[in-house]
């Protein structure tokens, strides 16, 4: 599903059983090229604009529930999106730390380029992109997936089974874990998946088979 799809088309197609995943809009530390992790930084001006554009794209989808993390950048992205929604009305917003970004441990707050100069680009690449090697004091993608995927199965899938359209506003690595699970992507392949800020991803839920299909 392209981002420039007409609103009427989205409204007609996604009446029920759709999952929308979105990484929060650009944060202040994204703009400064810093490791963020669980540090609770706000959206940048660009990030607010990204959330507004996503809200316009999704404005005719009747959502039944929003799931988001415990961090303000994801929560605010969801708030902005829903403030531009024309059809959903007041809906529950579920906030849970299991959808948080990977914890980057000792790297949180550090500039990525400066960290690469200090520790070597190869080591920093391993910390950032390997599946099971955590940064010092932090989480690997594998550890992130071990909390994110159970949340997805226990809290999000039941909403889809109930016929709800579901918005999940979260983070690059928590969403990477969910996409890996949905699309059966291997650990070797998932580390190269890039998820852009503020860009909705559409999945259609089949009520009979329980399968999710990328649109």
Task: Walk through the language-model features, giving the residues of each.
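GST superfamily/GST-like fold recognition
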Residues: 172-176, 212
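Short, well-ordered strand-loop elements centered on a beta-strand within folded domains, enriched
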Residues: 208-215
